[in-house]
């Protein structure tokens, strides 16, 4: 399957986006950007911080082609959203980890990209404050499209390591949790 990076590059040219926001674990694992493949995202049903607003990968897969374990070509769905009776195989394969079919083609629903987006990064001394801030921002009238907390908690394995490795902003030293809130709109 095609790398997500390539798909997003083409979509950006047309001011479109994959609304489920493919997550990139490269930053957490080795500090490098490598989104992986579209098939991997679908097989694992992995979505990024926009999931609570736009839905998961399975909500954006319109159809697919692939090969099952018997070597048979399987085709499901199409290029438009429609309600059908019976099993929706396009939704069933999401999160199946490739056990049902090896994907060769995927049709995604895409949405217009926002004209503007800003991400606020707030350092908090206590995790409780970070959680409260996140809850208040999501329930506010602002168009929050993504939110995350990176805890600085000794009880959470590797939390200090990830913050120090990934989020050194302009060489600023900080202690505590990080709350990230993204607001989109026009």
Q: Which residues does each predicted region cover?
A:
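FAD-binding glycine-rich core of flavoenzymes that anchor FAD
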Residues: 1-91
């Amino acid at each position: 399957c095609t790398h997500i990076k390539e798909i997003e590059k083409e979509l950006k040219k047309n001011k479109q986006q994959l609304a489920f926001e493919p997550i990139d674990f490269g930053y957490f694992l080795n500090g490098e950007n490598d989104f992986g493949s579209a098939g991997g995202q679908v097989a694992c049903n992995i979505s990024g911080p926009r999931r609570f607003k736009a839905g998961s990968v399975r909500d954006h897969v319109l159809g697919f082609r692939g090969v099952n374990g018997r070597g048979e070509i399987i085709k499901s769905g199409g290029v438009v959203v429609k309600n059908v009776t019976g099993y929706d195989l396009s939704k069933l394969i999401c999160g199946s980890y490739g056990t049902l079919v090896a994907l060769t083609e995927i049709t995604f629903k895409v949405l217009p990209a926002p004209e503007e987006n800003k991400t606020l990064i707030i350092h908090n001394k206590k995790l409780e404050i970070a959680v409260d801030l996140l809850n208040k921002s999501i329930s506010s009238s602002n168009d929050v499209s993504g939110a995350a907390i990176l805890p600085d908690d000794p009880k959470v394995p590797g939390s200090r390591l990830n913050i120090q490795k990934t989020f050194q902003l302009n060489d600023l030293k900080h202690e505590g949790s990080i709350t990230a809130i993204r607001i989109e709109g026009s």
